[in-house]
Amino acid sequence: QPMRDVDFSGSTVVVTGGACGIGRAIAEAFAAAGARVAVLDVKHEETASLLEELPGEGHLCVTGNAGVEEDVRSFAEKVLECFGRVDVLVNNACITRRGILSGCSFEEFNEVLRVGVSAPYLLSLLFRDHFSRGASIVNIASTRASMSQKDTESYSAAKGALTSLTHALAMSLSPFGVRVNSISPGWIDTGVFGVLSPEDAFQHPSGRVGSPEDIVKAVFFLC
């Protein structure tokens, strides 16, 4: 449901990994609030269905791999061709290839970094001169950056790097009038992990796992 008293009419919002889970909830919420939404996601069917289901008109949903430079550059070009500027960039896309106990290879490890760290940097660079004054970049990091579990080296490293990238981008883009922040969710019930256990809930001070809507509210607050 649209959040009350929130209006992003006329804004261009870019969301990576926006066809499923947290990213989809963010894309749908911005569209419901009047924004024009541009989504990049590697999952073709989910990306196509999102375009049909988003409230409003004029959205852009592109199937592409955030870990492939050519796909990221092509997506950025399409965004600027369609909308001319960017008001909000949500870097949400990430993958995991497990870690050292699972024998995560050098290439698999770097694939995770390309999707979770290099793509946010490249999009920030490509949009640098096209952000509106007062634009916002929100990077979806994770508590895994500082509170990890075994066999999560690829994902944890990517989220830790994304947190550090956030600090640096905030300093570098401040003269452009661009704000840069990150959100570090804990367990979020997106359905991807099946039924989460009571132990997962007890990790959080609230005593429950989060919902995608919790992250949407945090993103809106930062934008």
What label would you give each PLM region?
Residues 5-37:
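Canonical Rossmann dinucleotide-binding motif of NAD(H)/NADP(H)-dependent dehydrogenases/reductases
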Residues 124, 158, 166:
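Active-site helix of classical SDR
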Residues 102, 134, 147-153, 175, ...:
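Active-site loop immediately N-terminal to the catalytic Tyr-X3-Lys motif
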Residues 182, 203-223:
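C-terminal helical subdomain
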Residues 129, 171-175:
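Alpha-helical segment proximal to the catalytic Tyr-Lys
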Residues 142:
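Residue(s) in the substrate-gating loop at a strand-loop-helix junction
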Residues 100-101, 105-110, 193, 200-201:
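Substrate-binding pocket helix/loop in short-chain dehydrogenase/reductase
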